[in-house]
Amino acid sequence: MHPYTVAKMVSSLGHLYRRRVYLNMVAGGFKNDLAALNDLTPHDKRYARLVEYTTIIQQLLKGTSPVSYQGEFYVVDKLRMIPPLSADLIPGILVSGSSPAGLMAAAALGATAVKYPQPAECEPDCQSDANESGIRIGIIARENEDDAWRIADLRFPEDRKGQLTHQLAMKTSDSAWHKQLSRMASESEGTRGTYWLWPFENYKTFCPYLVGSYQRVASEVAKYIECGHRTFILDIPPAKEELEHINLVFSCARQMLTK
């Protein structure tokens, strides 16, 4: 999809619904899929390409004059966006921040660098980072911890086929975050805490989960906020009601931070 097509879609959504959207810009991390498309671009170069791609989108949406851009991967000449998008609807940009190349791309674009976090007590402080920072997690929380774990086990049972697929994906991905999570899963094998990688190990999702009581999960979320993370991308919940439980967690975390 050409950057102009993306910009046109964003502009159309803005005019139709008067709502701001966020764009999650992905460089691609599964080498076999890229090779099937005859895309042999190295990991860091893919982020350089992503910067060019996103820069054209940003310039089209932010400006009222024609856009000309000469890059290594993309070239446009006097390309105009009609109608222009209102300034208050300019999309936020999210970029993977798990690798140095991703962090550099986020900084170049003024984007939020999103990562897959370590357990809260091990997460490095990022408050001094140049870019805004966020994390992707799943949350299963209830008033009673045993209830939360019962739901977690029902939602993510052991899946041998999924485990084999996960192992294959480890061999074909050059994504820094995939390697980091896989290493942490191996190191924590046989243990069970609030930070839970079982869904990731069974190829059901690509992020860690926080499981436990409202108070316990909120304590972990509060620690991530104290580290400097301000954006939280949640794994897709199975039902609307699950969002109500998650909202209680964030309300509790905010209360902890104001004490």
Task: Explain the meaning of each model-derived region.
Residues 2-112, 121-122:
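Internal, glycine-rich beta/alpha segment that forms the wall or movable "lid"
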Residues 22-24, 114-115, 134, 233:
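Conserved beta-strand positions in the central sheet of alpha/beta enzyme cores
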Residues 26-30, 98-100, 118, 136-142, ...:
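Active-site beta-loop-alpha junctions enriched in small/polar residues
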Residues 37, 43-83, 123-223:
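An alpha-helical appendage that flanks or caps ligand/catalytic pockets
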Residues 49, 53, 247-259:
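Alpha-helix-loop-beta-strand connector modules within alpha/beta enzyme cores
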Residues 118-128, 241-244:
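Active-site-adjacent beta->alpha loops and helix N-cap segments on the catalytic face
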Residues 207-211, 230-237:
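Outer-membrane beta-barrel pore domains
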Residues 220, 227-230:
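Conserved, well-ordered alpha-helix/loop/beta-strand core segments that scaffold catalytic motifs
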